[in-house]
Amino acid sequence: MKKIYIDGMSCDHCTAHVREALEALDGVGRVLEVSLSGKYALIEGSASDDALTAVIEEEGYDVIRIE
């Protein structure tokens, strides 16, 4: 499981865009949660940190860190 801290999400549409982008990425098994208030996404899978960062940044958001 990975927790991705994301800056720039400001509404439910933002969280939906992040969820859709992550779900489309090879190596992401499931998106467990995308939290607007917590500014993070929680995923299961084997996608690399670089791939996760790239797909989120392509949507216009910044990855702060991945745990």
What are these regions (language model features)?
Residues G8, A41-L42:
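A generic secondary-structure micro-motif detector
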Residues M1-M9:
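Short glycine-/aliphatic-rich beta-strand segments at the starts of folded cytosolic domains
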Residues V34-K39:
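Short Gly/Ser/Thr- and Asp/Glu-enriched loop/turn motifs at secondary-structure junctions
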Residues Y5, H13, Y61-D62:
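Aromatic side chains
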Residues K3, V31-E33:
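Residues at or immediately flanking beta-strands
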Residues E20-A24, V28-R30, L42-E67:
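C-terminal structural segments of small proteins and small subunits
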Residues M9-V18:
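Short, thiol/selenol-centered motifs that function as redox-active sites or metal-ligating centers
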